[in-house]
């Protein structure tokens, strides 16, 4: 989403497709925005062009795209995380594509459980030693996942405090559980 303003300033005038949550989160609003309908994750524009999309498990609003044009299939996804503690993911297993573009800054999924345990163990060690624990996180994405991880790990033993913006996001997502797991809201 960070390149949209740059692209439009350099002549791009086409539609920009995104989820409603993403639109709410970004500062620069594209001139020609198309909002995805969460009740219709598949769209056939004509016989030669179809679009399917799903949640990536990265943050509220993050989606992957599966586009078919003239019989060719393209898969695009930013960060993708199955089994996230907070966010839902629509698995992409079984999809095949002629071209896949994947921007993934996180560790492999087979290491995610061990990585979360190591983070929780380090936090527990610090808290048990009465050390302060401050975790600067982005306003969207892993901050809520980490809060959920710590709550699942520590329960009520250590209270979790978060910025007003992060707390507001938690409450806002709680009214619409489309991107977050229902059992945690």
Pin down the residues of each PLM region.
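Short, conserved secondary-structure transition motifs
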Residues: 141-142, 161-175
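Feature recognizes metal-dependent phosphohydrolase scaffolds
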Residues: 159-160, 179
């Amino acid at each position: 989403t960070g390149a949209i303003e740059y692209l439009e300033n350099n002549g791009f005038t086409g539609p920009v497709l995104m989820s409603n949550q993403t639109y709410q989160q970004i500062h620069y609003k594209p001139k020609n925005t198309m909002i995805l309908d969460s009740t219709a994750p598949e769209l056939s524009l004509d016989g030669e062009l179809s679009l399917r999309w799903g949640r990536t498990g990265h943050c509220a609003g993050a989606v992957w795209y599966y586009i078919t044009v003239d019989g060719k299939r393209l898969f695009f996804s930013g960060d993708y995380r199955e089994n996230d503690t907070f966010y839902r993911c629509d698995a992409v297993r079984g999809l095949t594509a002629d071209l896949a573009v994947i921007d993934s800054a996180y560790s492999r999924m087979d290491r995610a459980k061990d990585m979360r345990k190591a983070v929780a163990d380090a936090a527990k060690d610090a808290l048990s030693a009465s050390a302060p624990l401050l975790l600067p996180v982005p306003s969207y994405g892993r901050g809520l996942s980490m809060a959920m991880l710590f709550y699942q790990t520590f329960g009520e033993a250590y209270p979790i405090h978060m910025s007003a913006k992060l707390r507001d996001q938690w409450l806002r997502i709680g009214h619409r559980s489309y991107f977050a797991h229902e059992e945690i809201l």
